[in-house]
């Protein structure tokens, strides 16, 4: 049997050579699906602090800061901006492990007055304004060279990125790490957890509650079909690592009409069952289904 290969271009930075069977699978996915970028969803990168050693704290440090508050009012204000944070390593397929890490969420977009948070201010001052300021300058302190965060217009106590989309973290959402050694590692979050800049979040761009839709989409994103498509449109980190960057994830065609049928919900978290449903819905041949089961 003669095997053909086809060079496929996906953009300036992504191209792939596909076999006949890979091209057939790709075409069936695209025929049935709508790219995520054309959905009513938003995808955002997680929070870039510019200095995680200061802005990411343990539960013990959080309790210490709250314990140093002068009164209950200050304590409540301060607790409200010390938020649970997920790192890439914390996010697994269909879930995550909260490692008791917290983010000091002083986002520039929120325009906080640090003097309203004396205990938090004291904690940050102890680290040093010279290290936290966003000037890009270098200082010599006690004979040690200290490099400030990169130059921005933000204040010394604020995160490096403005995070104008801060309210998206409070919505029900899908979260994932940019780098993955296990293929697909998407999880559902409805507890208001934030994520670091090595992760992404996806939420619907309205104020409706979309738990069912998000969990169905989650099943698809954790499927062999989604992993296959990412594999052919992006450059892998290495032989066993994938990069789930926004620019690639938003290109994945999601078969909206198929996966949201009442009798076709992909919410049982059973990978084999979800893959089998998708193979049938996409009209994959037995050879194509077997190919996805064994090649990815």
PLM features per residue range, with description:
Residues 276-296:
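Conserved AMP-binding
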Residues 1:
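A conserved non-catalytic segment of reverse transcriptases
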Residues 4-261:
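Polybasic, glycine- and aromatic-enriched phosphate-binding surface used to engage nucleic acids
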């Amino acid at each position: 049997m003669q095997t053909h290969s086809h060079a496929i271009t996906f953009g300036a930075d992504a191209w792939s050579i596909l076999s006949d069977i890979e091209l057939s699978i790709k075409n069936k996915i695209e025929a049935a699906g709508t790219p995520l970028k054309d959905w009513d969803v938003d995808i955002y990168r997680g929070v870039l602090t510019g200095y995680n050693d200061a802005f990411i704290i343990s539960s013990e440090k959080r309790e210490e800061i709250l314990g140093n508050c002068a009164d209950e009012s200050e304590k409540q204000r301060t607790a409200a901006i010390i938020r649970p944070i997920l790192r890439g390593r914390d996010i697994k397929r269909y879930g995550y492990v909260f490692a008791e890490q917290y983010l000091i969420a002083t986002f520039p977009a929120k325009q906080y007055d640090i003097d309203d948070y004396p205990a938090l201010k004291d904690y940050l001052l102890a680290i040093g304004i010279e290290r936290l300021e966003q000037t890009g300058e270098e200082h010599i302190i006690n004979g040690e060279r200290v490099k400030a965060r990169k130059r921005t217009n933000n204040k010394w106590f604020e995160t490096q990125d403005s995070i104008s989309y801060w309210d998206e973290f409070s919505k029900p959402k899908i979260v994932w790490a940019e780098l993955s050694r296990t293929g697909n590692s998407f999880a559902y979050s409805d507890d208001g957890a934030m994520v670091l800049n090595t992760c992404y979040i996806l939420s619907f761009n309205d104020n409706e509650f979309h738990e069912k839709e998000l969990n169905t989409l989650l099943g698809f994103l954790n499927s062999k079909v989604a992993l296959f498509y990412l594999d052919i449109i992006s450059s892998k980190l290495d032989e066993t690592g994938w990069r789930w960057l926004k620019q690639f994830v938003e290109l994945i065609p999601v078969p909206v009409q198929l996966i949201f049928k009442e009798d076709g919900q992909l919410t049982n978290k059973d990978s084999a069952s979800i893959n089998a449903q998708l193979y049938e819905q996409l009209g994959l041949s037995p050879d194509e289904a077997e190919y996805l089961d064994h090649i990815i």
